[in-house]
């Protein structure tokens, strides 16, 4: 990519999904991830990475959390206890952004069966080329 390439302009992708059983919402998932509409290969790489991240998150919710939510819902119904839908969120926070660099972290938060759980991971990006950076390169 040439030196005059347009750097990636970062926006936000927001999406929500709900899973239901017998008309009752048992799982709610939402995400806020970086996105871009910047044309060119750098923008495409960046967009593709986080769109795949979003699909993977919702697939994880479908395959892992939805069965757990069903089990908890059925147990609550059998024991005549109140039920609250399970929650999962994927949220990104930008910590540094300039024309060349982007540093951010993403929290995956789950609340399953009343026990909160959080995993944090960080990413760094060269916005002019659209490639991830190692911590050393930041």
Feature locations, PLM:
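Compositionally biased intrinsically disordered regions enriched in Thr/Gly
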Residues: 1-138
């Amino acid at each position: 990519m040439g030196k005059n390439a347009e750097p990636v302009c970062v926006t936000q992708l927001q999406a929500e999904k709900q899973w239901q059983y017998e008309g009752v919402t048992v799982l709610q998932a939402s995400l806020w991830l970086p996105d871009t509409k910047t044309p060119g290969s750098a923008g495409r790489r960046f967009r593709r990475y986080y769109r795949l991240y979003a699909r993977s998150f919702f697939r994880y919710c479908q395959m892992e959390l939805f069965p757990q939510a069903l089990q908890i819902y059925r147990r609550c119904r059998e024991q005549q206890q109140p039920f609250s839908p399970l929650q999962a969120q994927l949220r990104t926070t930008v910590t540094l952004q300039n024309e060349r660099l982007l540093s951010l972290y993403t929290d995956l938060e789950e609340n399953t069966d009343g026990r909160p759980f959080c995993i944090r991971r960080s990413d760094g990006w060269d916005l002019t080329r659209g490639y991830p950076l190692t911590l050393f390169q930041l």
